[in-house]
Amino acid sequence: MARWGAARMAACGPWGRNRRVGAGDAFEASEVRRDGRSRMMPACGPWGAGHGGGDPALERELSRDGSHYSISSAILPSLGARSNRRIKLRRFIISPYDRRYRIWETFLIVLVVYSAWVSPFEFGFIPKPTGALATADNVVNAFFAVDIILTFFVAYLDKMSYMLEDDPKKIAWRYSTTWLVLDVASTIPSEFARRILPSKLRSYGFFNMLRLWRLRRVSSLFSRLEKDRHFNYFWVRCAKLICVTLFAVHCAACFYYLLADRYPVPTSTWIGNYMADFHERSLWIRYVTSVYWSITTLTTVGYGDLHAENTREMIFNIFYMLFNLGLTAYLIGNMTNLVVHGTSRTRNYRDTIQAATSFGVRNQLPPRLQDQMISHISLKYRTDSEGLQQQEILDSLPKAIKSSISQYLFFHLVQNVYLFQGVSNDLIFQLVSEMKAEYFPPREDVILQNEAPTDFYILVSGSVELVEQQNGADQVIQVATSGEVVGEIGVLCYRPQLFTVRTRSLCQLLRLNRTAFLSIVQSNVGDGTIIMNNLIQFLKEQKENSVMAGVVKEIESMLARGNLDLPITLCFAVTRGDDFLLHQLLKRGMDPNESDNDGHTALHIAASKGNEQCVRLLLEYGADPNARDSEGKVPLWEALCEKHAAVVQLLVEGGADLSSGDTGLYACIAVEESDTELLNDIIHYGGDVNRARRDGTTALHRAVCDGNVQMAELLLEHGADIDKQDGNGWTPRALAEQQGHDDIQLLFRSRKAATASGHHHVPSSTTTRVAPAAAAASLIGRFNSEPMMKNMIHEDADLPSRVLPEKLRRKRVTFQNSLFGVISSSQAQRETDHPLSRGGLAATGSPNPSSGSRNAVIRVTISCPEKGNTAGKLVLLPQTLDMLLELGAKKFDFAPTKVLTVEGAEVDEVELIRDGDHLVLVSNEWDAEKMKGKS
């Protein structure tokens, strides 16, 4: 610790080597030395006083890492850099990116501007140092002398390693071998220079001209301003060009006057010929005249009133005009570039419009298509010119920023679309991140009828019409407005688009690609089921449209047959009340105890809806009758609440009771509703009226608070405790006294007296409890399966059926690549990986009798060819082959001895028979070859 403190003290210097991170210090963060070591050190020194952890000022400084300095000029961290929080420089060494050092540099630039004007002026017009001008020069030189000393302590960026070099020796050597000589020469006072120079060179401004070396700082300033987003680039460039022009004119004017002033014959000079007594004229008149001739020469106007009179002036004019050629080219080139850049979009727009018009005329396109082409190009130009290039901007951003922007703009819109009602926010966030916003002009086709389903759109603004072509004419079927979705039927069902979608006004649409959509659904199978249900419900509501009705029938047919191995959850089938679909799903090995995010199982839903057949199927396939959801509810409670007596009986026969649920909650609900029948049912089916809710409240507490004497009496009859405390320490007795319920207090006293005398028997709530389920059923677990999806194979879209010849037309639209088919691939993988599919269930999907699940309903077709019956009869499979033979004898009035398959193979074990098999009952005299011949 002492060593660390000493190191900290040694690190502090007058220039704040370890100063706080300022606006320009974003990448000075980690202590990265050339030896590769990294260490965190506190800041100290007058240019950045040290602060402890959690200092608000330091946090404010660190929050400025995103400033324009940190991006435009500071050090970028190298690949693999472990930290970028602070650079520890040596003692007395200053970072070139320190905020205060930059302020110092900006102050020096003001002095450079002064030097740029005064140095040529003194060189041309002032013969010797005088008054305030000489004093000002010396003050400016003093500041630059300080800067020379300061430069020996400023770290520099090594161009090889791109790291700050803070070795004082290397800094001094680099400065000494580069700019030190010129910097020192430009700060020599004029008086001292006149003394050390020969008499012929004792010009006042000779050494002053070396100060122009400082102009490199102005060039750096303009370079930095051009990259600064707070300044307009056009005006920064214009200011730079103006400064260059004025400086050239000023220098040339000073040189012109110097030539005339030093010429032996004053009248033989450019100004002496025009103004013979120019030496007696004021300094202002001479300077203005010089600037006048300089600028007329620069602009090549040349009125002829001023011209060169001697050889010196002619030679200078030659070089000056050569310089003007280069300067003029530089100015014109820069201004042309700035102007052309502003008009290039318009030029490209006109060229594109002309090309599109020529294309339409040359290919004899219909006027409607030509208008759509022109409208689309015009809208694109408008969005570009108004700064609405949203997709270009979003594509240039990182994924996280792009997703955040999309979520902010479109999340609530997508959330309210009917297709995504009830899905998780995670799915909507993923969908919004993949959507692309597009503009469409009025009367433009967005989707064409019968085209391949590649995208669907959500309307942000505007309206579109759904058009169907009938007998060669367009008929508007429906109008969609903001917040609605179009094209989803073709994408989800993988069939050609049903309608042409055409804009009615300027529209902004969100486009979602089918491939991206289905990829997201792959990882959200539960939400995919909700989307399918929403689609089916929406299509059912479109009864007046025959096309929609046909799509509904097709989807319903595929669902009923279960031919697609759809991974539709059991909850989906139960919600629809489709017991046949539920049976198909259970036979495929789906977990009967699979729950949703709230813990609801299919048995919860079936019990709540009172669907006896679904409840029976689920129990036969091993559903846990006492499964508990996140709220503590069990299926039996759902059935009791809805008064489904038949379902209650089925559940009780399957081993259901209320003891595994939150019976305290149940009893409180019954008391709140003052439902004595429900309370009696709770007690009858294993509920404990003394059990408390999560907050410690019992049903008796609730009855006392409500002043319900009848419910309180019923609870007391079944063993409710009047002295049981809730979460706040209140007992029912204390509550009755506190709230002044005299009837309940009297009831409590009489009940206590009867109990003390021993004349009243209080039945235990456990004496009527239903026997628990079998051990095997109680061990059945519930889990929320997350199916592993197979990689989806995106086949090429089929050609629209309506544009194919009749012989090449598909007989039926395939759903293999629809949303149903895509999600079904996940179910196949889940069945393969499911633990119940290995050992727990037979390979066929039928329950294995060895596992105790033989109670499943298996239907088979039996026939007796010896009696002339080949069509067969559908019967339930008995438990043994002997029972099956007896059943056949009754059905066909015949005594069979063997069971064969339709292929002629003899069946020896009933476990080999699958649901839906066709069995043949024959006698020993039957020849199997006859059956093969018939088949």
Swiss-Prot record:
Q: Enumerate composition-biased segments (Polar residues).
A: 845-854
Q: Which segments occupy the membrane without traversing it?
A: 289-308
Outline which residue ranges sit on the Cytoplasmic face.
Answer: 1-106, 158-178, 227-240, 334-935
Q: Give tissue specificity per the record.
A: Expressed in roots and coleoptile of young seedlings.
Note the topology in the membrane: Multi-pass membrane protein
Its subcellular locations are: Membrane
Keywords carried by this UniProt record: ANK repeat, Ion channel, Ion transport, Membrane, Potassium, Potassium channel, Potassium transport, Repeat, Transmembrane, Transmembrane helix, Transport, Voltage-gated channel
Q: State one molecular function term (GO).
A: voltage-gated potassium channel activity
Annotated region Disordered: the residues are 826-854
Query: Which ranges does the record list as Extracellular topological domains?
Result: 128-136, 200-205, 262-288, 309-312
Q: How is the quaternary structure described?
A: The potassium channel is probably a homo- or heterotetrameric complex of pore-forming subunits.
Q: What does this protein do?
A: Highly selective inward-rectifying potassium channel that mediates potassium uptake by plant roots. Assuming opened or closed conformations in response to the voltage difference across the membrane, the channel is activated by hyperpolarization. May be a major salt-sensitive potassium channel in roots.
Annotated organism of origin: Oryza sativa subsp. japonica (Rice)
> How does the record comment on the protein's domains?
The segment S4 is probably the voltage-sensor and is characterized by a series of positively charged amino acids. The pore-forming region H5 is enclosed by the transmembrane segments S5 and S6 in the Shaker-type (1P/6TM) and contains the GYGD signature motif which seems to be involved in potassium selectivity.
Q: Would you tell me the protein name for this molecule? A: Potassium channel AKT1
Outline the inducing conditions. Answer: Down-regulated by salt stress.
Query: Gene3D superfamilies of this UniProt entry?
Result: 1.10.287.70, Ankyrin repeat-containing domain (1.25.40.20), Jelly Rolls (2.60.120.10)
Q: Which family does it belong to?
A: Belongs to the potassium channel family. Plant (TC 1.A.1.4) subfamily.
UniProt KW Cell membrane keyword: no
| Record-listed a nucleoside 3',5'-cyclic phosphate binding positions | 419-538
Tell me where in this chain the KHA domain is found.
859-935
Residues in ANK repeats: 565-594, 598-627, 631-660, 662-691, 695-724, 728-757
Has the keyword Repeat been applied to this entry? Answer: yes
